[in-house]
Swiss-Prot record:
One of its GO terms (molecular function) is N-acyltransferase activity. It holds the Pfam family CN_hydrolase. The chain crosses the membrane at residues 24-44, 58-78, 85-105, 125-145, 162-182, 192-212, 482-502. The gene is lnt. InterPro entries: Apolipo_AcylTrfase, C-N_Hydrolase, C-N_Hydrolase_sf, LNT_N. It comes from Pseudomonas syringae pv. tomato (strain ATCC BAA-871 / DC3000). PROSITE patterns: CN_HYDROLASE (PS50263). This is Apolipoprotein N-acyltransferase. Keywords: Acyltransferase, Cell inner membrane, Cell membrane, Membrane, Transferase, Transmembrane, Transmembrane helix. Its EC number is 2.3.1.269. Pathway: Protein modification; lipoprotein biosynthesis (N-acyl transfer). It is an enzyme of class 2 (transferase).
Length: 506
């Protein structure tokens, strides 16, 4: 305990280990109690530190979290980006060192302005607000990297029932509050009224989560729809090879021709690995086949659009043909994968910065949803499904959710299963069915409670068959989003700052 709370390298090393523990609480390990241990160690580790010492302690925690939880970055850079093992390792370490600052800054803010060791109840509430703030901030700053939120650990745990009420961030707030209160219970015993309030605040989110876990916030807006989702399992080395184009198109054509009757036929991200205008004949043929069978065909395909200046913008898109309509352009792009920041400086340095289709433009904000079989479908391409607020905006207008992805970049790492877990949380938050079609897994159907009903294992070629049900009505989260929680956090911050100022003048 003394090493955790005091300054110095022993405490920093424990913070490093504490950050890594969160990874074990998330998919694919799912030992969720460890997230409470991790957050509690972060909280205790800042108790006696100066702001400068807290800055280092927070950075160590962030480095441990991202070092363990995003180790798949090395696979993407080395295996698929063409970088040497040494260079890939160096780039990964630089990336992790940079994003670890997401924890260094809130740790400094905590030690500088918010910490109130003399008032454990107020301290616990303020810490919960800070914990939520750091998660929201790292999902927003510089387009965001909303990965490894602590709330995802509760997908199959007691707090899952809070997701439709306030999203994954409400769960994270509850975890931060729980961890801090557990650390402070012995200090609350001095005053029985404070102890009673502390126990009430400790139990409330867990009781509410369990009570709401099986509550249905939405209801069907139509009959079940049959789905056939294709998983081609195409190697990334073949994906953009022009000599392999016809083989890939033939693969999805034949899988579709041989598939069972379905209302929705879904192909993954960039299943058509050529510009839409170059594949119009192929898409028209497949659309006619789908329409003749009473189905809508939804596929990922790159799209080129004129800008009006004799130039073109390229988009990562989804299009619907057959008994459906609409094209959607991806709005949340993956840095370096789909666009290169500072590209005039970085392009040409290593092949990782010159990957095929790494110069996409961002899709407009006001796009219409896809339509298929008379229903509105909220589309998310790969990385987009990890943004809670962004996903909520589209989900609120929809009957069904759809995410298409190419998780080949992750290799055999834990990345694809983390990605799947976040998609499950989006379905739970929205109270809607989700269709998830990927190139190499995990292709799955997810129900409104975030549970997988059917799936195809990773690295297998096949067709997933199942049913989804269009849903209407809004969960509280889709209706209010995170505004109530944001207001509560601001009030808690204000309370902590005011109380600290008063205590200094007394």
């Amino acid at each position: 305990m003394r090493w955790i709370t005091r300054p110095g390298w022993p405490g920093n090393l424990l913070a490093l280990a504490a950050g890594g523990l969160t990874t074990l609480a998330l998919a694919p390990f799912d030992f969720w109690p460890l997230v409470l241990v991790s957050v509690a160690m972060f909280y205790l580790g800042l108790r006696e530190l100066s702001p400068r010492q807290a800055l280092a302690r927070g950075w160590c925690y962030g480095f441990g979290l991202y070092g363990a939880g995003t180790s798949w970055i090395y696979v993407s850079i080395h295996t698929y980006g063409g970088a040497s093992a040494l260079l890939a390792g160096l780039l990964m370490l630089l990336f992790i060192a940079a994003i670890a600052l997401f924890f260094a800054l809130p740790a400094w803010v905590w030690a500088r302005w918010l910490r109130r060791n003399e008032a454990p109840l107020a301290d616990s509430l303020a810490f919960a607000a800070l914990w939520l703030w750091q998660e929201a901030f790292r999902g927003w700053f510089l387009t965001g990297f909303p990965w490894l939120y602590s709330g995802y650990s509760q997908l199959d745990a007691p707090l899952a029932g809070l997701a439709p009420v306030g999203g994954v961030w409400l769960i994270s707030f509850a975890l931060g509050l729980t961890a801090a209160l557990l650390c402070n219970l012995h200090r609350l015993r001095a005053r029985k009224s404070f102890l009673a309030m502390g126990v009430l605040l400790l139990l409330a989110p867990w009781v509410a989560g369990l009570a709401l876990k099986d509550h249905a916030w939405t209801s069907p807006s139509g009959p079940p729809l049959k789905v056939a989702a294709m998983q081609g399992n195409i190697e990334q080395s073949m994906k953009w090879d022009p000599q392999k184009l016809n083989d890939q198109l033939a693969l999805y054509r034949d899988m579709t021709f041989r598939s069972q009757q379905a209302d929705l036929i879904v192909w993954p991200e960039t299943a058509v690995p050529v510009l839409k205008e170059s594949a119009e004949g192929y898409l028209s043929m497949m659309g006619k086949f789908a329409a003749d069978r009473g189905a809508a065909l939804i596929t990922g395909v790159p799209v080129r659009e004129p800008t009006g200046r004799g130039e073109y913008s390229y988009y990562n898109g989804i299009t619907v043909t057959g008994q459906g309509d609409g094209t959607y352009f991806k709005q949340k792009l993956v840095p370096f994968g789909e666009y290169v920041p500072l590209q005039d400086l970085l392009r040409g340095l290593i092949s990782f910065f010159d990957l095929p289709m790494s110069d996409f433009a961002r899709g407009p904000n006001d796009q219409a949803l896809l339509q298929a079989k008379g229903y509105h479908i909220a589309p998310f391409i790969c990385y987009e499904v990890v943004y809670p607020e962004f996903a909520a905006g589209l989900s609120a207008q929809s009957d069904l959710l759809l995410t298409v992805s190419n998780d080949t970049w992750f290799g055999t790492s834990i990345g694809p299963l983390q990605h799947l877990q976040m998609a499950q949380m989006r379905a739970l938050e929205a109270g809607r069915w989700m269709i998830r079609a990927t190139n190499n897994g995990v292709t799955a159907l997810i129900d409104p409670f975030g549970r997988i009903t059917v799936q195809i294992p990773q690295f297998e070629r096949g067709v997933l068959y199942g049913e989804v049900v269009p849903m209407h009505e809004l969960t509280p989260y889709l209706h209010w989003r995170s505004w109530p929680l944001a207001i509560v956090c601001l009030l808690l911050f204000g309370w902590a700052l005011l109380a600290a100022r008063i205590s200094k003048t007394v």
